[in-house]
Design a protein with these regions (language model features):
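C-terminal interaction appendages of subunits in large macromolecular complexes
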Residues: 1-167
């Protein structure tokens, strides 16, 4: 069993030979073998069992670049990685943060409602973003620009259907 902390919050079932993926709020992720005790980043936003040959699991993310403050959206799959090496979902600049992340095991693409922080001359405070308009790329892709304005919150509007054809 995979647990988040000493209190024993159950996350998911796994075996002794499984590998896990841990993603932090600042955009770093690491894939590691299951051990009795493993230490990962602070501020974890996703922990799950990682399957190396899985091409159907698609991650949908919206992140803020730390250097420019521009918000990007991307859909990506993680297929080949080196164990215990740190990778980055964002562009890797200091101050970058993941604002929205979902792991969809069948390639689903959801729609989200984005609320922007109120600023002068900003007329549209609420916008919608549909992940099905994005192509599934590699983890190193930058993504598409969502907005240059500061995002206050993101909420799930609707779950989407799978964008990957059947086997």
């Amino acid at each position: 069993n995979l647990k988040r902390d000493d209190a024993g919050e159950f996350i998911c079932d796994c075996s002794d030979i499984s590998e896990i993926i841990a993603i932090s709020k600042d955009g770093h992720y690491k894939i590691s073998k299951i051990t009795e005790k493993s230490f990962f980043f602070t501020d974890l936003i996703y922990v799950g069992v990682f399957d190396r040959g899985d091409t159907r699991t698609v991650y949908n993310a919206i992140y803020k670049d730390g250097k420019t403050g521009v918000n990007f959206a991307k859909r990506f799959s993680i297929t080949s990685v080196t164990k215990d090496k740190e990778y980055d979902i964002t562009m890797g600049t200091p101050g970058s943060a993941i604002l929205w992340l979902t792991a969809n095991h069948n390639g689903e693409a959801e729609s989200v409602k984005i609320r922007f922080k109120q600023q002068k001359k900003l007329k549209k405070l609420i916008d919608e973003y549909d992940f099905s308009t994005l192509a599934i790329k590699g983890r190193t892709s930058r993504g598409n620009i969502v907005s240059k304005h500061t995002i206050q919150s993101i909420q799930l509007k609707s779950l989407g259907v799978s964008t990957i054809s059947g086997k």
